[in-house]
Curated annotation (Swiss-Prot):
It comes from the Eukaryota. Residues 137-152, 397-421, 1073-1107 have a biased composition (Polar residues). This is Uncharacterized protein C63.14. It is found in: Cytoplasm. It comes from Schizosaccharomyces pombe (strain 972 / ATCC 24843) (Fission yeast). The modification Phosphoserine is found at S686, S905, S1018. One of its GO terms (cellular component) is cytosol. Residues 941-950, 1138-1150 have a biased composition (Low complexity). InterPro entries: Eisosome1 (IPR024527). Keywords: Cytoplasm, Phosphoprotein. Residues 705-767, 783-792, 849-863, 891-902, 920-932, 999-1011, 1032-1045 have a biased composition (Basic and acidic residues). It holds the Pfam family Eisosome1.
Length: 1184
């Protein structure tokens, strides 16, 4: 324990569990804080071997087989053996004997009975026995006395007999006082005081030991260092001191190894065989004497009993402890001097050497065994230089378990009131491994007394036989060469249950598995690979060689006489000499002792019992053990006399050097203990090495998993992108389909509207022509806006025969509900050929095909019998105009059809055309009426022109108030004479010639099929296919009503349309005009700015001027018309019919442009936008 200044730090339960626990009492006053350590003021300073003597009893003895077998069932696999605690408790109860009743705090007290010879010889006692007894006495002086319930009443009560004379046979010191016990005290107190005085007297004369015969080089500081190492590294000194404590000399490690194992690691020839038996005998006897006293003062509490009153018990403990401590003189001046010196050094070197001095004085005596079972945990705290007294090592945390089998040692703690002497908390600084601290004076003495009873007058053979048997079991129990953790486990468990598979590999596999489990990897694969790495790992310990001492550091030469220096002693070695014998052991006994009851021969590095295969090894071990303590103590005393004048004190220099070396050794050992992992077979591995092994196996796996994960992510991204693109394409297709559907619906709607409007216009035109025929010319309406001309798609495929029949039947039965045909033709003006859209109404759609054919035949016959002297070119021109009137523009755009019709058209007389037109205009007239009409027309024609002339009228557009009529008269000789007449009308419109069809017999089959109303190629069938859906009639009517209301609100006059035709019938005769049309002007301009008839675009102003119903702002902006026609829209439509036109159409060749062949793609047909406020069809809303 640490003693700094004038106060003492009380050890905690973590430092002194079990028999040595200081928590069993709590002094009520600060006066009790002056209780010094268990062994007084540093007993190792006054004589170090006295401290060691009480510690090493267990190492020289063995437990009885019956006790091992009895408690083998209580074995723990990886923890401290509960059997160990039970065994110590049993030894304490057995060693204690009843005594007379005490008057303090117990009803029945005990004293110690120890049987020995009535006249003990001086040779029996070891010089260290007194100091050992004093140490044991001080350890138990502050503990309560045992309860009478744990002591058998059959024991006789006798006082403990301490020798009162000189303890050395050859000592020059006078004999001590023969006074029995101090007077004036109670019997127990007198006995305590007498034992203490005797122990101090024996220790004071220990330096007068006779001169030794064996020389050694182990000085006193080295022996102190060995004692210190034993206290803190009990079973690790030989294994780890050489490797992790470089500043401690090899002699210190060797001495520590001897103290730890009880077997000097030296060749047997170094020691003198004469001292073997005597030294061992004295040592064992005196250890038993000291242990008997310690066991008598032990207190065992059964768990089944009712717990005592802790308050009253504590008060009794405090009062009794204070009274006894005040009466005992156990504190020396040397201890106070050392405490003061250590305190000064710590304060002076707090920053620089705090780590070196930390924990030295405090932990010198912290070597008590731990009867409480602890559970190992991983380190939780680390070393800190600023707080050297509280955080010196990387600590191991232990968790106390419950009591085992009902027997525990009750402990109580005392808290210090001084701040600088505060004991660190349990979890922060256990300065040693409690799991390994099992070689203390109390438990060692108990086991020694339990297992060894010296005979009254033993013989050499008996002693050697018993000693050899004990040493053999001890060495076998060490399981060398193993690391400290396995050694400590072996010491705390019966040998029958030691299984290296659970002891050695359990911890390494558990830690490795837990670490790898945190990585979330494949544990099965990783564990197998890790096990392979561990098996092939080269252990840290070198190959063991026979009879070798501890290996010194490589940078420090060995001062010992050992030729080889491994770190551990191995019982597998082969004896160098073959003449050793097992003294006093029969082969049967040897076989019994060497039999192993656990099955691990195939799993350990050595497979046979070393004492069975090499009998000489047992003798060497026994002899070296007997020589160990006595020879070491003699050498120390001899060298100490020459080194110091006062042998009771140690130089301050030696103490400082020892503190520095041991502090560093403790830190290194604690760090190694915290980090070293035992992998079995005497091998340890650091966490860094284990991590490297694990990473070597894990990294390829992790890399592969990462690569696979990256590939999988890329694949998912690609799949996602493909899915997105597919969805986008699908959406685009859906939108396109929707747009196409909307476009077709809009086109269909426009076609319906155009068809209905055309029908309405035809009806109104028919009424207007009738009015003109009856009453004369009427001013046409004035339109400010235009409608978009009709556009016909390409000719559809021929319908099947069923569809043809259906179309024929439909044309016969539909009557006036049919749509009229619409065509485009050129109206010839002054300077331009303006493409106008004309609606020709065939009013006889309701007739049957048979009636129609009859009418056509009649017209054809009339044409044959009429005027036959008409020029063929004139007839061709007349036929062309007839075709333009009947066949839609789509048919005329077909060059093959147009050329066929034009080329094969015969000449016929204009009278036939007039008669045919008249017949067509009156489909329901009787034969008499038609004949009368024809005769009237013929007569008028004869009167107006001679027979040798044929008159052809061309109506040109004039000014806003005039219609210019140009008449071309062709003589018999072919000369043409043109006359122009101007007729003033209100609002003229362009008119084109309308003549009847040529005779059918002169047409080819294609033309006949086109002209036949029943043919699918006829305009009637074409209109039927184009305008099947007539459901928008109400919508058109509603639209026309709205447009009419707008125009009426604007104050415009609604005038019926008018038309000028070639009818030469009598004025007043009620006949329909030959041509019923309604024109919609659309400008046709060549792409280079020239108009259709070859004149410059400047003439277009005249055209616009003669178009009263055309809004100037709606004229397309093409060519050089930009200034005059601002804001118009231009669009390119289908190819324009390139029918040749000119001022005179009789010969089919234009006189203005006779040599120019025109192409339809050179012209742009501009559909004039509807920008006027005047609606379409507003003039006809009354008729709807």
């Amino acid at each position: 324990m640490s003693t700094l200044g004038n106060s003492t730090v009380k050890p905690t339960n973590a430092e002194f569990p079990g028999l040595h626990a200081m928590e069993r009492y709590k002094p009520a006053t600060s006066e009790s804080l002056y209780v010094k350590g268990h062994y007084g003021p540093h007993p190792h300073k006054e004589h170090p071997a006295a401290y060691v003597a009480a510690k090493t009893g267990f190492n020289a003895t063995s437990r009885r087989q019956s006790v091992r077998e009895h408690h083998s069932s209580h074995e723990g696999s990886a923890q401290l053996n509960p059997d160990r605690i039970l065994y110590m408790s049993a030894g304490a109860v057995t060693a204690a004997v009843p005594n007379k009743e005490h008057t303090d705090n117990v009803t029945t007290s005990q004293t110690i009975r120890y049987e020995t010879s009535s006249q003990p010889s001086q040779e029996v006692y070891h010089p260290h026995a007194g100091k050992a007894a004093q140490s044991a006495h001080v350890m138990n002086s502050t503990e309560s006395r045992p309860s009478s319930a744990h002591v058998s009443s059959s024991y006789t009560q006798k006082p403990f007999a301490f020798p009162l004379g000189p303890v050395f046979a050859t000592s020059s010191q006078a004999a001590a006082s023969e006074t029995a016990l101090p007077s004036g005290y109670e019997p127990d107190e007198a006995r305590f005081i007498g034992a203490s005085q005797l122990a101090k007297l024996s220790a004071s004369h220990a330096h007068q030991t006779p001169a030794q015969t064996v020389d050694d080089d182990v000085p006193l500081p080295t022996r102190m260092a060995a004692t210190e190492l034993v206290g803190h590294i009990p079973l690790r000194a030989a294994n780890y001191a050489n490797e992790y404590s470089q500043d401690v000399p090899a002699s210190t490690h060797r001495a520590a190894s001897e103290l730890v194992h009880g077997v000097p690691m030296r060749a047997s020839g170094i020691n003198d065989p004469k001292h073997d038996l005597d030294a061992a005998t004295r040592h064992n006897i005196n250890s038993v004497a000291a242990a008997s006293y310690v066991a008598a003062r032990s207190r065992v509490i059964e768990e089944e009993e009712e717990p005592p009153n802790e308050v009253k018990e504590r008060m009794d403990y405090e009062a009794d402890a204070q009274r006894r401590i005040r009466k005992m003189n156990v504190f020396g001046s040397a201890g106070a001097a050392l405490r003061e010196r250590t305190q000064q050094d710590l304060m002076a070197n707090e920053q620089e050497h705090s780590g070196e001095f930390a924990g030295f004085s405090r932990n010198l005596t912290n070597t008590a065994a731990a009867p409480t079972t602890y559970e190992y945990k991983r380190p939780t705290s680390s070393y800190t230089a600023k707080d050297a007294t509280s955080k010196v090592y990387r600590s191991n945390t232990y968790k106390p378990k419950s009591s085992v089998n009902g027997s525990v040692y009750r402990s109580k703690s005392v808290k210090s009131t001084t701040s600088h002497n505060k004991v660190p908390e349990r979890n922060s600084v256990p300065a040693y491994n409690e799991k390994l601290m099992h070689s203390s004076a109390a438990n060692a003495a108990i086991l020694s007394h339990k297992n060894y009873s010296p005979p009254v007058q033993p013989t050499r053979d008996d002693e050697v036989s018993q000693e050899d048997a004990r040493v053999k079991e001890i060495v076998r129990g060490m399981k060398l060469p193993l690391t400290s953790s396995s050694l400590s486990a072996a010491a705390y468990r019966p040998m029958e249950k030691q299984d290296p598979a659970t002891v050695e590999r359990h911890h390494i596999q558990a830690e490795a598995t837990q670490r790898v489990r945190d990585m979330k990897l494949d544990l099965t694969k990783l564990e197998s690979k890790t096990n392979d790495e561990i098996r092939s790992y080269r252990p840290r310990n070198v190959v063991i060689k026979p009879y070798a001492a501890a290996t010194p550091p490589k940078n420090i030469p060995s001062t010992y006489r050992a030729p080889q220096a491994p770190s551990v002693l191995s019982p597998v070695v082969t004896a160098s000499e073959g003449d050793f014998e097992l003294d006093g052991i029969t082969p049967e006994r040897q076989q019994t002792m060497t039999r192993s009851t656990y099955q691990e021969s195939s799993q350990r590095p050595f497979h046979e019992d070393p004492f069975r295969t090499h009998p000489g090894l047992l003798q060497a071990v026994a002899r070296n053990h007997r020589n160990s303590l006595a020879n070491i103590d003699e050498r120390i005393m001899r060298q100490n006399q020459a080194a110091t004048a006062n042998t009771n004190t140690v130089s301050e220099t030696d103490i400082e050097a020892l503190e520095r070396r041991l502090s560093k050794a403790y830190r290194m050992e604690a760090q190694e203990e915290a980090y070293a992992i035992n992998i079995g077979g005497g091998r340890v591995i650091s966490p860094e090495e284990l991590e490297e092994i694990a990473r070597r196996n894990v990294d390829p796996m992790v890399s592969e998993l990462s690569e696979r994960a990256a590939q999988e992510r890329e694949r998912k991204e690609q799949a996602k992108e493909a899915k997105r693109l597919k969805k986008l394409a699908k959406e685009e297709k859906r939108l396109k389909k929707k747009e196409e559907k909307a476009r077709k619906a809009e086109e269909k709607r426009l076609q319906k509207e155009r068809a209905k409007y055309a029908k309405q216009m035809s009806r109104e035109s028919a009424h207007a022509d009738q009015a003109i025929a009856n009453t004369g010319p009427v001013a046409p309406p004035y339109f400010e806006h235009e409608t978009e001309p009709s556009h016909y798609e390409e000719e559809e495929e021929e319908e099947p025969e069923e569809r043809r029949e259906e179309s024929s039947h439909f044309s016969e039965s539909s009557g006036n509900n049919e749509f009229e045909e619409t065509e485009q033709e050129y109206t010839h003006g002054y300077g331009n050929d303006v493409l106008v859209q004309r609606t020709d109404v065939v009013n006889n759609f309701g007739e049957s095909s048979h009636a129609h054919d009859n009418a056509v035949n009649e017209k054809r016959d009339l044409g044959r019998n009429g005027f036959g002297d008409v020029d063929e070119q004139d007839a061709t021109e007349v036929y062309r105009h007839s075709i333009e009137r009947i066949v839609p523009g789509d048919y005329l755009h077909d060059e093959k059809t147009r050329d066929t019709l034009t080329r094969e058209s015969p000449a016929f007389r204009s009278e036939e055309a007039v008669v045919e037109v008249a017949d067509e205009d009156h489909p329901h007239a009787s034969e008499a009426e038609r004949a009368h009409s024809y005769s009237n027309r013929k007569q008028a024609s004869s009167e107006s022109s001679p027979e040798s002339q044929s008159t052809h009228y061309n109506d040109y557009e004039g000014t806003e108030d005039n219609i210019v009529r140009q008449t071309t008269t062709v003589d018999e000789d072919g000369h043409q004479e043109q006359t122009t007449s101007t007729t003033k009308v209100a609002h003229p419109i362009p008119v084109s010639n309308g003549l009847s069809s040529p005779p059918r017999e002169r047409l080819d089959d294609n033309a006949k099929e086109i002209l036949s109303r029943s043919s699918p190629k006829s305009p009637v069938a074409w209109f039927k296919r184009k305008f099947k859906n007539r459901k928008d009639k109400a919508a058109v009517k509603r639209m026309l009503e709205e447009d009419s209301s707008k125009q009426l609100s604007s104050g415009r006059d609604v005038v019926a349309p008018t038309s000028v035709n070639h009818d030469v019938s009598h004025v007043g005769e009620s006949t329909k005009p030959a041509v019923n049309n309604s024109t919609k002007p659309v400008a046709v301009t060549s792409k280079n700015g020239h108009s259709r008839n070859g004149s410059h675009a400047a003439h277009s102003n005249n055209v616009i001027g003669t178009q009263p119903h055309v809004n100037v702002s709606a004229v397309p902006n093409t060519g050089n018309l930009k200034d005059a026609l601002e804001g118009s829209a231009v669009s390119k439509t289908d190819d324009v019919d390139n029918v040749v036109s000119g001022h005179s159409n009789v010969n089919g060749v234009s006189k203005s442009r006779p040599n120019i062949v025109e192409r339809s793609e050179d012209y742009v047909i501009s559909h004039l936008p509807e920008q006027s406020r005047a609606p379409i069809g507003a003039a006809f809303q009354e008729d709807l």
